Amino acid sequence: MSEFQKVVVIDAKGHLLGRLASVVAKQLLGGQKVVVVRCEELNISGHFFRNKLKYLAYLRKACRYNPSRGAFHFRAPSRIFQKAVRGMLPHKTARGQAALEHLQAVEGIPPPFDKQKRVVVPAALRVLRLKPGRKYCTVGRLSSEVGWKYNDIVAKLEERRKVKSAAFYQAKLAKQKKIASAKEASPVNQKLSQFGY
């Protein structure tokens, strides 16, 4: 993401949560608008049980005499990612708030973004940054175990999207094949047109 674009759509699948958040925070401070899709497929290093215990300890942090005053603990993967990015921004200043407004994080790949080019961040990919054999877990599983109710719905919508996407890709390949064969036949057609065919 060296050059500035209007909007960058990042596919979060297979990325490490903290590493991706740091890259996104840096881009936001530079004025770049960033959309992060498939937040439920983000990875966290360390085995699942350890991460769940850490998250449950975080959930216990509250105001003793009136918990509705805060702190607020979001369970959705997109909100967990936004909170991670917020911690890397000066969010109490006008500059930090403006940067945070340029971030959009969603579960799955909803309609505006399923037709757009998605990118990955090599510096944050688990297969490149985590040692082979190390334990890791997904944010989606963690969220669903601490109170996020929409894991099944997002999975169902993703299956539908993948079927549509595969059909579109096959149609695109067929169209490219036709264009290629037409280009190959063009010299022959020119020769035939000289003789009135």
UniProtKB/Swiss-Prot annotation:
PTM-bearing positions, type Phosphoserine: 193
UniProt cross-references to InterPro entries, sorted A to Z: Ribosomal_uL13, Ribosomal_uL13_CS, Ribosomal_uL13_euk/arc, Ribosomal_uL13_sf
Subunit: Component of the large ribosomal subunit (LSU). Mature yeast ribosomes consist of a small (40S) and a large (60S) subunit. The 40S small subunit contains 1 molecule of ribosomal RNA (18S rRNA) and at least 33 different proteins. The large 60S subunit contains 3 rRNA molecules (25S, 5.8S and 5S rRNA) and at least 46 different proteins.
CDD domains with a match to the protein in the record: Ribosomal_L13
Cell compartments where the protein resides: Cytoplasm
Other facts: There are 3 genes for uL13 in S.pombe.
Example of a GO cellular component annotation carried by this entry: cytosol
Family stated for the protein in its record: Belongs to the universal ribosomal protein uL13 family.
Ribonucleoprotein found in the keyword field: yes
Identification of the protein by name: Large ribosomal subunit protein uL13B
PANTHER family with a match to the protein in the record: LARGE RIBOSOMAL SUBUNIT PROTEIN UL13, RIBOSOMAL PROTEIN L13
GO biological process: cytoplasmic translation; negative regulation of translation
Alphabetical UniProt keywords: Cytoplasm, Phosphoprotein, Ribonucleoprotein, Ribosomal protein
Source organism: Schizosaccharomyces pombe (strain 972 / ATCC 24843)
